[in-house]
Regions:
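Short regulatory "switch" loops immediately downstream of catalytic or recognition motifs
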Residues: 80-81, 199-205
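A glycine-biased structural micro-motif
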Residues: 71-75, 144-158, 163
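Active-site neighborhoods of enzyme catalytic cores
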Residues: 2-54, 149-153, 158, 169-201, ...
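Short acidic beta-strand-loop surface patches of small beta-rich interaction domains
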Residues: 136-141
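NTP-handling and nucleic-acid-processing catalytic cores
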Residues: 2-135, 214-248, 289-290
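Anion (oxyanion) recognition and catalysis
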Residues: 122, 162, 181
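A preference for well-ordered globular domain cores
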Residues: 184, 204-216
């Protein structure tokens, strides 16, 4: 089947307390800051980020494999004894997804709080420590950070970097911030155990075509025409970048997912409940767009 349950990065709305789809995100241009700093005085590479609060969850620094500035560091690991009260182990990795022109050309990798970093972790077999919870609050750190909202933790960490002489640059930038269409809450990328539809899996009954292939086919065969025509580029760009669709939601309205679990984590899927009292139904509901598509 195409539907599976997996622990993956989702778009989490801390205000609505639910996952949302990529198409329910509204990007708002906001004033922000880009910070350039080192994890410690003896760390060899400076990184740039607009979210210093996530850096306590860093496990690697990624550089472009052809960037001559960092070639001698690739493959090495460094122990950071104290990054604002947190001990880090940071490995230097080479990844073609890194833009050598952005910031210092070195990217702090926080797999649990960025879809790009999560995919890097897949490619490089990196750990995924989570440092932010569903309420957009910090889950690790000393008392000055633990339990603080991400915006508060950001200020605390920046001040710590400044006091330690690690902050090298602070720039004003404009940034597209992901917000939830319904609540206006700022989206927090989080790893969650959810239900997904695989858009890249070959479907035997459809000639081993994927869902992406089937979504592309009627346009290539001229069976469907996009008007005006220039939106075709938008559609195909969206299709090429389409990731597996998260179809589970933490909302009270909608079709409840027809899945039950027992104490041994066995899964039963049917429209009717299984026999016996040792089964608990999945508390999530289906994305309303998925539900409407069933009709």
């Amino acid at each position: 089947g195409l539907i599976y349950r997996g622990n993956k990065i989702v778009n989490w709305d801390p205000k609505g307390q639910t996952t949302i789809s990529d198409d329910e995100i509204v990007y708002e241009e906001r004033a922000s800051k880009l910070y350039t700093f080192k994890y410690s005085k003896d760390f060899p590479i400076s990184i740039s980020t607009s979210r210093p609060e996530t850096k306590i969850g860093d496990v690697a620094v990624a550089v472009h494999p052809e960037d001559p500035r960092y070639k001698n560091y690739i493959g090495k690991s460094y122990a950071v004894k104290d990054f604002c009260g947190i001990e880090l182990s940071v490995k230097i990795i080479a990844d073609k997804e890194v833009d050598p022109e952005f910031g210092t050309g070195a990217l702090g990798v926080t797999p649990a709080h960025s879809i790009i970093d999560w995919e890097m972790a897949d490619r490089h077999n990196l750990p995924r420590p989570q440092v932010i919870n569903e309420f957009a609050k910090m889950t690790v750190g000393e008392n000055n950070i633990l339990g603080k909202k991400t915006t508060e933790a950001r200020e605390i960490i920046v001040e710590w970097l400044r006091s330690e002489g690690l902050l090298e640059k602070e720039e004003d930038i404009k940034q597209n911030v992901s917000t939830a269409e319904r609540t206006g809450g700022i989206i927090e990328p989080l790893p969650k155990l959810q239900w997904f539809i695989n858009v890249n899996k070959p479907i035997k009954e459809r000639g081993d075509k994927t869902l992406k292939d089937l979504m592309r086919e009627p346009f290539e065969k001229k069976e469907i025409k996009i008007i005006p025509d220039y939106f075709s580029k938008t559609y195909f760009h969206w299709l090429e970048n389409l990731r597996d669709w998260c179809i589970s939601r933490q909302i009270w309205y909608g079709h409840q997912i027809p899945v039950w679990y027992d104490k041994k984590d066995q899964i039963f899927c049917d429209i009717k409940a299984p026999e016996g009292n040792n089964w608990k139904r999945d508390e999530d509901t289906l994305d309303t767009w998925f539900s409407s598509g069933l009709w």
